[in-house]
Structure formats: C-alpha cells, structure tokens
C-alpha cells in the first residue's frame, strides 16, 4: 500500500507567501485603485502598508483583509516612500511586483 507523506494541512500552509514591495517614487492614485479593483488576485487575503500617492501630501496607512480594505491618512514622519506587504496563497510574485511597479509614477523631470 502507498501513503502520502505530505498531509493536506502541511501543503496548505506552505502555499502561503508574502510579497514585499517598496518604491521611493509615489503611486498614482487612480492606477493603484484600478489595481485593487481589477487586478488584485483572489488569493491575496491580507495586505498592509504605508502608501504615498502623488495626489496627496498625506501618509496613507493601508489595511486589507479579504475583500475589505481601509486607508487612513496621517502626517509623514521621515522620508516618503511606499512600503506594502501582500499575504496570500500561491502568489505570482513577479506578476504582482510588475503590476505594482506599473502604479508607480515615473518622474517626468
């Protein structure tokens, strides 16, 4: 008889990954909203971070759980930057990083 050494629970836990993203340029607010609304995979169940939007002078604290998210603003202390962590199952890190990078404003100096 054969038995499987990998229990389902074990595999489920291993499937969870976290992706960190940071940038020293701000996000475009519309692009980021579009990412959340249309491109965020179902498999992302938790996200949090500090967001910098070019449209705002404020620092934005972002929390996502399931399909619900909140963004609270406050004053910046220190250098402005984006720092975001996504947690989910079997995430395509390269694709997500690419999509987030697409939300970053490229400076037009």
State the predicted function of each range:
Residues 1-77, 82, 89-109:
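C-terminal accessory "lid"/substrate-recognition subdomains
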């Amino acid at each position: 008889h054969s038995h499987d050494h990998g229990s389902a629970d074990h595999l489920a836990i291993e499937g969870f990954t976290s992706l960190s993203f940071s940038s020293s340029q701000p996000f475009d607010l519309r692009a980021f909203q579009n990412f959340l609304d249309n491109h965020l995979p179902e498999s992302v169940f938790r996200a949090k971070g500090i967001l910098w939007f070019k449209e705002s002078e404020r620092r934005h604290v972002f929390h996502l759980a399931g399909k619900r998210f909140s963004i609270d603003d406050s004053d910046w202390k220190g250098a402005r930057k984006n720092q975001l962590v996504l947690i989910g199952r079997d995430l395509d890190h390269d694709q997500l990083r690419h999509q987030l990078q697409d939300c970053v404003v490229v400076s037009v100096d």
